[in-house]
């Protein structure tokens, strides 16, 4: 099939941006990555050359001034998201924004209103909404397969940061948006909102298991880790349904990523023990009351059109597709920056609940955005 792109995109960030955003944009029939940004121009030029991109920049204003750039993806460290996204929106560029959205919900709300004023489409990269097994669970819940819900539990227990010799960088610093909240809980807050609706209140305990890490830019001197690597969060959902979230990035041999849903008619379990790929490997188990547990097969109509060795790529292609369609149809994408505000809100409230050591109420999202 001949590619006929109608959205030319600049990628900001050479980590996840280079590994996932560029190939996703190059694969999608209606998009083309044409530019890359990195603070080190030599690095940007190297990435541009290896990916056949026309432009490389270490100056964001120059990138945004390029009339050939219609949109940007932002995969820089979280502490840069707000300013970069704000500049892009003000320049009239559509934005695909990595999570966490910003460092504070007030910043995300500002981006939400700014995007509406400038009539640009901003989509958060909440990938689990686009994974077939998760989509099927959403359908089953919508059909009322479990009846009235009684308990929801999330375990996301991985060892990506379990090695104490892993380098100290922005990820180790809470003030720069590092930690398990931004990396993992940002997704969890979104998919719980998608599947079950808004939370009413929450309580939390955040902890740091590995207190120091070596800084390779400072002779491997040990530096303090201020960003949580473990988060235990309790939510109260609609109808007072309890939800327990257990997240850690320092679990050697952790069980992976599991969502357990218990209701009056039985239970659903969605999970993967694949610690090397957070998309591949999800399975669904249904245990109706009075019957044996059975594994469910995801309908082929929900399958990815193409799967890749890197499991992250297929759902991001679907995110890109929703983004492109929303731009072409001049409509708000799903998920939207409104959902990004909600995820950021719960991240902020989690920190507040931990610091104050008591339950905190979750404000109504529409009222928050109307202020």
UniProtKB/Swiss-Prot annotation:
EC number in record: 1.-.-.-
Gene Ontology molecular functions: nucleotide binding; oxidoreductase activity
Domain of life: Bacteria
Keywords: Oxidoreductase
UniProt family annotation: Belongs to the Gfo/Idh/MocA family.
Protein name per its UniProtKB record: Uncharacterized oxidoreductase sll0816
């Amino acid at each position: 099939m001949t590619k006929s792109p109608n959205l030319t995109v600049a990628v900001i960030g050479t980590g996840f941006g280079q590994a996932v955003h560029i190939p996703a944009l190059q694969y999608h029939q209606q998009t083309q990555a044409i530019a890359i940004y990195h603070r080190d121009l030599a690095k940007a030029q190297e990435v541009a050359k290896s990916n056949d991109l026309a432009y490389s920049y270490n100056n964001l204003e120059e990138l945004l001034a390029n009339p050939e750039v219609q949109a940007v993806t932002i995969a820089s460290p979280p502490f840069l998201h707000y300013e970069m996204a704000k500049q892009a929106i003000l320049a009239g560029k559509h934005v695909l924004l990595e999570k966490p959205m910003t460092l504070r919900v007030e910043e995300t709300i500002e981006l939400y209103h700014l995007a509406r004023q400038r009539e640009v489409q901003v989509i958060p990269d909440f990938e689990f909404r686009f994974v077939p097994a998760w989509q099927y669970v959403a359908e089953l819940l919508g059909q009322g397969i479990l009846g009235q819900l009684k308990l929801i539990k999330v375990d996301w227990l991985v060892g990506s940061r379990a090695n104490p010799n892993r380098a100290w960088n922005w990820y180790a610093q809470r003030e720069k948006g590092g930690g398990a909240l931004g990396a993992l809980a940002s997704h969890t807050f979104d998919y719980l909102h998608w599947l079950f609706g808004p939370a009413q209140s929450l309580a939390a305990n955040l902890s740091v298991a590995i207190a120091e890490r070596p800084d390779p830019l400072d002779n491997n001197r040990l530096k303090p880790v201020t960003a949580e690597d473990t988060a235990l969060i309790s939510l109260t959902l609609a109808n007072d349904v309890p939800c327990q979230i257990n997240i850690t990035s320092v679990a050697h041999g952790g069980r992976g990523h599991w969502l357990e849903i218990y209701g009056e008619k039985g239970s659903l379990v969605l999970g993967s023990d694949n610690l090397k790929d957070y998309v591949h490997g999800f399975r669904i188990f249904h245990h109706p009351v009075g019957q044996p547990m059975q594994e469910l097969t995801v309908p082929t109509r929900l399958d990815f059109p193409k799967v890749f060795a890197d499991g992250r790529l297929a759902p991001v292609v679907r995110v890109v597709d929703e983004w492109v369609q929303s731009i072409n149809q001049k409509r708000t994408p799903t998920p939207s920056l409104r959902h990004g505000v909600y995820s950021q809100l719960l991240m902020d409230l989690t920190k507040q609940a931990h610091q104050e050591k008591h339950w905190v109420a979750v404000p109504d999202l529409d009222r928050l955005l109307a202020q």
